[in-house]
Amino acid sequence: MSETTDKQLTEAEKRKLLRERRLAKMAQGKASDRLNTILSQGSSVKSVSPPAVTSVLENKATKSTDTATVTDSSTNATSVSPSAAKATPTSTGVSSAISDFDDPEIQDISDVAVNNSGVLALGNLSGLDSNNPSQPNLDEMFQKIMQQQSQHNCDNDNNGENNPMAEMLKMFNSMGGGDNNGGLGGFDSMFSGSPNSPPPESISPEMMKYQADLAKYHTYQEQLWQFRFLVVRILATIFNFAYHFITIPSFTASNHAYVRDLSEVYPLLGFMTIFTSIEVVIIATYYLLFTKLGLFHASNQKSFILKGISTLSMFVPQLLRYEPLVATFLGYKELLGIFVGDLSLVVVMFGLLSFSN
């Protein structure tokens, strides 16, 4: 037991002596030479000499000398700081050696961090909301889907193919109502594929908002002009009725034959003649004005008949050829409705007059 302890102490002493001897040798200024010799022995290319390096031991000695110089400032006024001594190498070889063998500088994390703006930009391209990147922007995704579908629809139209999906989207647009054709403004031009409509890529959210506002404006114009014509029709009918009621005695409606025979004495047919003439002028003006403003077929597109044709056309495409005829018939039905409405007003006034008598 004691022999083993003595042996360990002896080895420790040997290592301590060897270390002290090595430090003494290095303190004589031979540390850098030995380090350069070791580096030169490991070089595979003999023609190129390795750069001269400085040992760490000599750097420590230099630092200790500089520290002692700064402390003894009263005896040596021109002291050099350790940072200046380290920052000013004595030769180009030492500078290159430090840059080659020292640890690299710590890289700033901001240089390698993910740029949020780039992620948000990619998110916008993929349909993500910039305010909340984790949630998709449904409006932009829906717009891109419709643009792709409209482009596919244009290609199929050029090839003479029928696209059921395009017909379905067209039906939804017609059910929504809005612009001159009763659609949703820009959506109709997107899916129509007409040469006058802008390409799907050029339709921006601002353009879509403009088309929606334009559809609302057309609806307002249609309702405004219908109200104006309604006021004119009512006033014209009441004025015609009041004129004949004042100028013609016994101006009334009756089931008795002797009352109807009064037309031989009094020109009772003049009322219907004037009424019919006024109705012709009003209907003609209504048709010309609404056609000029592009509002004549706007309300017809909201009819359930056209919506039913659009729905059935997805299964029977041949029904689309009859859609313009049905739209024209509905337009003339509106004109006929004006005459029937005014005639109903006349019947009501005659009924009130007969009830009062």
Swiss-Prot record:
Residue stretches of biased makeup (Low complexity): 65-81
Bilayer disposition of the protein: Multi-pass membrane protein
Function of the molecule: Required for the post-translational delivery of tail-anchored (TA) proteins to the endoplasmic reticulum. Together with GET1, acts as a membrane receptor for soluble GET3, which recognizes and selectively binds the transmembrane domain of TA proteins in the cytosol. The GET complex cooperates with the HDEL receptor ERD2 to mediate the ATP-dependent retrieval of resident ER proteins that contain a C-terminal H-D-E-L retention signal from the Golgi to the ER.
Family: Belongs to the GET2 family.
Protein name: Golgi to ER traffic protein 2
Taxonomic lineage: Eukaryota, Fungi, Dikarya, Ascomycota, Saccharomycotina
Complex formation: Component of the Golgi to ER traffic (GET) complex, which is composed of GET1, GET2 and GET3. Within the complex, GET1 and GET2 form a heterotetramer which is stabilized by phosphatidylinositol binding and which binds to the GET3 homodimer.
GO terms under biological process: protein insertion into ER membrane; retrograde vesicle-mediated transport, Golgi to endoplasmic reticulum
Cytoplasmic side: 1-224, 291-334
CC terms in the record's Gene Ontology section: endoplasmic reticulum membrane; GET complex; Golgi membrane
Stretches for region Disordered: 65-99
UniProt-listed HAMAP family: Get2
Positions on the Lumenal side per record topology: 246-270, 356-357
Polar residues bias locations: 88-98
Organism: Lodderomyces elongisporus (strain ATCC 11503 / CBS 2605 / JCM 1781 / NBRC 1676 / NRRL YB-4239) (Yeast)
